């Protein structure tokens, strides 16, 4: 019986990791790599492995509540997952990322290896020094221990999560509530489209002039060859005249090229403005449908929760409190105290906890992947380097993000579900610090996002579609 159960547990672990790895590979090739030809096999393998181990951490949180695996199997799975993920994040990814950048720059393989090793040494030193400024576990057992490494990764990952959450807490109501949706007239869009067409046609006409000027310069150079057969005096006069004409043509070409560049920039701005107005018009039309009304109500509900979260985070920062239960669990507890419906409060709380943790995990994964796609396309389109370098950087961020989410989700678990997580991560990790740090960065990010979105909304209302 025990042998069969061990086979079952091993099959579940291997199958889940394989499925998650395949999902990461599919996401990379179908959603990120779809516009790029450069596809390194090792980069794809690293991304899929980091994705699998990262999502497996969140899966193990669910396994703590749902008894799919035994305690021993979960403990082994936790340790192996954390060991492999930290090995990738702290050692392998920094080294290989630097090595690949040096190789892409034309550095020889031996020198690239030495340069990557030196970079890894500097990275580890900076990684160690980071712990001086934050509450860290005792270093009696050395630096390369699970609590030490997890604590430092947690600082970076929690900071990233707080920044994204702060922006989302402000941007989500702003995007959903119909109060902030503009009413756009079709005549305004048509007027801008005419400007765009006129700008494009003018740009094309000036490009044709540039080509004609270049052809004329080439003809003058050809006529210079024919003038060599003429008299000496005619050659001198012809040379002077052609020189003046060529200088004038080159000056005209430079002026035309500058005008074309300005017109292309104007056309780009006009196109973006037309696109934004079309989106705003579609959003206004959608807001008048029944789905739009539901989304509007959802926006107000999210606004209430986001305001509550911001106030609780501000309270945690100001009064240095460690935080309380999540609002959903609090509301359920109040409801059970007011209305006796004959339901076991402990049992209902357990199912509510499972549902809430599942929602946290789904929202966390979905939100991260959405921001991952936006960041990838934004960085890749401005030409910051090869797509392989961007994918390696995102792999590093992804692992830190999901590992840090465990430090925060742990507090939402009931005490009986925290045991293995606390033991594996390290009992002397300052878990409350990460919640206070998250709240501080969350409040700062939300406030900054509120200021920026308010300025954007004000400027948009004062001048809806003015383009200089």
Swiss-Prot record:
Phenotype caused by lack of the gene: No visible phenotype; due to the redundancy with GTG2. The double mutants gtg1 and gtg2 are hyposensitive to abscisic acid.
Spans through the membrane: 7-27, 45-65, 82-102, 114-134, 153-173, 297-319, 345-365, 389-409, 437-457
Sections of the chain in a coiled coil: 243-279
InterPro entries xref list: ABA_GPCR_dom, Golgi_pH-regulator_cons_dom, GPHR/GTG
GO terms classed as biological process: post-embryonic development; response to abscisic acid; vegetative to reproductive phase transition of meristem
UniProt activity-regulation remark: The GTPase activity is Mg(2+) dependent and is strongly inhibited by the interaction with GPA1.
Signal peptide (residue range): none
PROSITE patterns per the UniProt record, alphabetical: PROTEIN_KINASE_ATP
One function term, GO molecular function aspect: abscisic acid binding
GO cellular component: endoplasmic reticulum membrane; Golgi membrane; intracellular membrane-bounded organelle; plasma membrane
Superkingdom classification of source: Eukaryota
Residues given in the record as GTP binding sites: 382-411
Localisation: Cell membrane; Golgi apparatus membrane; Endoplasmic reticulum membrane
Pfam families, sorted: ABA_GPCR, GPHR_N
Tissues where this protein is expressed: Expressed in cotyledons, leaves, stems, roots, flowers and guard cells.
Family: Belongs to the Golgi pH regulator (TC 1.A.38) family.
Functional summary from the UniProt entry: Abscisic acid receptor. The GDP-bound form exhibits greater abscisic acid binding than the GTP-bound form. Required for seedling growth and fertility.
Subunit structure: Interacts with GPA1.
UniProt-recorded name of the protein: GPCR-type G protein 1
Organism of origin: Arabidopsis thaliana
Encoding gene (name): GTG1
